[in-house]
Amino acid sequence: MIIGTRGSQLALAQTENVARLLKEKGVETSIKIIKTSGDRFTDRPLHAVSGGVGAFVRELDDVMLAGEIDIAVHSMKDMPTIRPKAIPTVAVLKRDTPFDILLTYDGTPLDELPEQSIIGTSSLRRTAQIRRYRPDIITQNLRGNIDTRLRKLREGQYDGIMLAKAGLERMGWEIEGEIFSPDFFCPSPNQGTVAVVTREGTEAEAAVSMLDHTESRIVTEIERILIAELGGGCTTPVGSYAEITPDRQEIHVRAEVLSLDGREAIRIDEFIPLRGGIEKARELGHRLVEMGGRRLAEEALLQISRGADSENSCDY
């Protein structure tokens, strides 16, 4: 079976892990690299590439529907909420660390960085969250693979860089930094999770289904439902995070929408029952809208369309 993937270091690491897991199940695979629009246009923010929605996903869907690949591996947070019915998410792998990490040259934490320090990030959400806590900090766009980002930090182009901790883990790199609690920096929906998709009704679907991790599937679905009605995807400062409690009776859910400048935030932080959690998450999503979440998201989209913060989007 042929697995399609982006060609970045991180995407290849994720795909090689899936190939290894399938081999353990007796399934032989080969890997085919697909160049996506998100990879081709690294000189511009993601929201300027195909509208920012599915910039790393759409081309893989196309080659799968054309029968050129059997399986595709994605960072789940890159995947649009609305997906082709013919390409189901067959497996959600066990989640890696879902939180953000700040790397600075000398290990200085966010609250001790000097005024006017420059932090590189590719995420509107992280930018808004930084501004909420440290409005004196300057945020600048930072795209490229993880090696490139670390090199720019070492060269002094930034005083710090913020990215997903999971990316470092998947590369096998142990780098010390400040890891942020979801109570402080609510992560992007599905951050730290890898999804595996196939065409419906194929041998690949049956094989990949053996890799599905039930708990990770539950919480990632909850996270998507919480923010589904807000719209905007990676082009709005939105976070959501769900985790099953140790007693396995409830799910702790957090979701927030921020203004681009971080001065306004609407947040939900509640426990919902594990059984029936999907419906309860929908109710909380409606409440987030009623509290003004959609208004904030729409205002952010309008500002972006006018050029405000055009340097930032999502990504790792």
Curated annotation (Swiss-Prot):
GO biological process, any: protoporphyrinogen IX biosynthetic process
Keywords: Porphyrin biosynthesis, Transferase
Catalytic activity: 4 porphobilinogen + H2O = hydroxymethylbilane + 4 NH4(+)
One GO CC term on file: cytoplasm
CDD domains reported in the protein's UniProt record: PBP2_HemC_archaea
Pfam family, one: Porphobil_deam
UniProt entry tagged with the keyword Transferase: yes
EC number: 2.5.1.61
Modified residues (S-(dipyrrolylmethanemethyl)cysteine): C234
Comment on bound cofactor: Binds 1 dipyrromethane group covalently.
InterPro entries given in the database record: HemC (IPR000860), Porphobilin_deaminase_cofac_BS (IPR022419), Porphobilin_deaminase_N (IPR022417), Porphobilinogen_deaminase_C (IPR022418), Porphobilinogen_deaminase_C_sf (IPR036803)
Pathway assigned to this chain's UniProt record: Porphyrin-containing compound metabolism; protoporphyrin-IX biosynthesis; coproporphyrinogen-III from 5-aminolevulinate: step 2/4
Miscellaneous comment: The porphobilinogen subunits are added to the dipyrromethane group.
HAMAP family (alphabetical): Porphobil_deam
Purpose of the protein: Tetrapolymerization of the monopyrrole PBG into the hydroxymethylbilane pre-uroporphyrinogen in several discrete steps.
Protein name per its UniProtKB record: Probable porphobilinogen deaminase
